[in-house]
């Protein structure tokens, strides 16, 4: 009798995706982040669903309803802490996943990569509207500052901003629609994840060497299910340590005060995972220029496949490109630090230099390094 998982129409899909899937035998722990992101998404949807059962999206009661969840709902404090810190874990895994893609040349699977960039943008949009929901000071002013950037668009900007707000400023209508967006977007993300996997399974996974792995494949189960389970243990351990021992360390103290349109916080800043883009936005003194730089900082990922000049796919055997990659990583950490600092010297100039270096590395230096490495590998006799 044939195994049910190989004959049943639904089980067959699961089997081909997670059990009998041929996977390269040499993929490292850097390939764990895809499954970890899937787990993060499930955690966020489940905790978010329970939070939505007790939350009210009204300017008068939103802040109180979050306090009520933490004080009166059974394990409400835990659900909220898991949801808030789960977002940080989600972005940590996302950044590492994208970094892995750049380092090992996974971006050459263009369809998978492009869907991935769309996923990144959608997750960022979801996190932004979600941060507004507790209706604390930083929620309100963060929403005001970021939505106000739309007004920099020539001719239609102000109309567009007011259309998003549902009035002449961030208010009740804005909060209600942001809650609606925050509820629906994770399901759109889930659909995009399925498309992402669909494209990935058309080509199969890349591997650290960047060489075609077809001659040496192993079944996904049990080898990589066990490996992913280990990654999951580390993820859950980190998330629980964060949520149980230091739940507010990544948040902003201003968000413990209810939103007050008459009192501006001294330093308006987003959550840590947006700080690198916020630093790039602030490094340009012109409003429209800043908005364009902000968009470019993420959308630049779409042009990376077209800037691949090296004869080798992976950076595994390309020391110059490796050096530039780690400079880029350090540069992003610098931008994250600058994004959280006040707008004064020396932070302004450091932010501007780091922003220039960010674009210079991706658009100029890394493609040149690829060409130089090709030249170095050519026989000279």
From Swiss-Prot:
Binds 2 heme b groups non-covalently. Heme b b566 binds at residues 97, 196. Its main location: mitochondrion. InterPro entries: Cyt_b/b6_C, Cyt_b/b6_C_sf, Cyt_b/b6_N, Cytb/b6-like_sf, Cytochrome_b, Cytochrome_b_C_euk/bac, Cytochrome_b_N_euk/bac, Di-haem_cyt_TM. Heme b b562 binds at residues 83, 182. It is a multi-pass membrane protein. The chain crosses the membrane at residues 33-53, 77-98, 113-133, 178-198, 226-246, 288-308, 320-340, 347-367. The keyword Plastid does not apply. The cytochrome bc1 complex contains 11 subunits: 3 respiratory subunits (MT-CYB, CYC1 and UQCRFS1), 2 core proteins (UQCRC1 and UQCRC2) and 6 low-molecular weight proteins (UQCRH/QCR6, UQCRB/QCR7, UQCRQ/QCR8, UQCR10/QCR9, UQCR11/QCR10 and a cleavage product of UQCRFS1). This cytochrome bc1 complex then forms a dimer. This is Cytochrome b.
